């Protein structure tokens, strides 16, 4: 009996000894799974002060990288050979520019459309001389804003909302992609992209007009109508709402009427009908809207459609497809040109193009080769 009991005890001890590593492995796996589940729940939680989301996991490092490199480049980047002819252009503040004239100079024309990360250059100095920071900033920035737009869709999905906010943000995304990516691709080099700065933006606009006469494009004109018309409509809507506020019963007439609104209240905060009647008498009855839903849809759709049109105009101009533009009127039977105010724009465009021409001097070979030419 003693031997059997000892054998039993010994057997039980050995089984416990072999089961300990397995239990430890299972506990470690459970901890790893729990950590991953906690991370997933934190990423997709709508209780956070700022929603992260899975697209936010992609957006945050890209935006931080673009912002960090932009700040360093606009402060201390060395001159860049943008035209690829050995004439560097300084754009940083430490190179003598101020906050208005400073810009991140586009990647050199010698690079073209090639992918140019740091490890493709022979040295950091060569990478900086060829404008590598511009490509790094632009690519990370575009990935970041596209991820931000998808993050808006993700948050709307989590909250059970419709995806119209994400759809509206496609307008600035389309404009950024058109100017920073599609236009340089159409022109064959990233050096044709917009410099990242205040004066660089205006220089890009003037040069774009000189090369493509974008002011005569109907798509650009639709963009102007959408942006300025949307701003006018938003100002009208805000002023009408402020003018027709309904005073709350909890506030006396001596208090400001602006204190009468609380987030989530059931009763309306302004008189929609009074605002529409005002528009009837001010402009025209057809200008008014039957309900606030159609009004707010119009306020969102007008500028978004306008920016889409302007971005499409830039995309078409990128590949030099200018057949949609308005050209100078001409009497075909007599061959006579009808002069209009558009001629002034054409003259200005020609002047800008002449001022921006690069002067490349070709010297004779006998001067560049160092040979002595006998005097005759």
From Swiss-Prot:
The record marks 183 as: Tyrosine radical intermediate. Residues 11-22 have a biased composition (Polar residues). Disruption phenotype: No synthesis of chlorophyll f when grown in FRL, decreased accumulation of some proteins up-regulated during FRL photoacclimation (FaRLiP). The record marks 212 as: Stabilizes free radical intermediate. It comes from the Bacteria. The chain crosses the membrane at residues 51-68, 140-155, 164-178, 219-240, 298-312. It is a multi-pass membrane protein. Residues 1-22 are annotated as: Disordered. Coiled coil: none annotated. Its main location: membrane. Induction: By growth in FRL (705-735 nm, 26-30 umol photons/m(2)/s). It is an enzyme of class 1 (oxidoreductase). Belongs to the reaction center PufL/M/PsbA/D family. Homodimer. Synthesizes chlorophyll f or chlorophyllide f (Chl f, 2-formyl chlorophyll a), probably by oxidation of chlorophyll a or chlorophyllide a and reduction of plastoquinone. The reaction is probably light-dependent. Chl f absorbs far red light (FRL, 707 nm in 100% methanol), and is synthesized when cells are grown in FRL, where it provides the advantage of extending the spectral range of harvested light in terrestrial cyanobacteria. When ectopically expressed in Synechococcus PCC 7002 (which does not grow in FRL and does not make Chl f) produces Chl f (0.059% of total chlorophyll). This is Light-dependent chlorophyll f synthase.
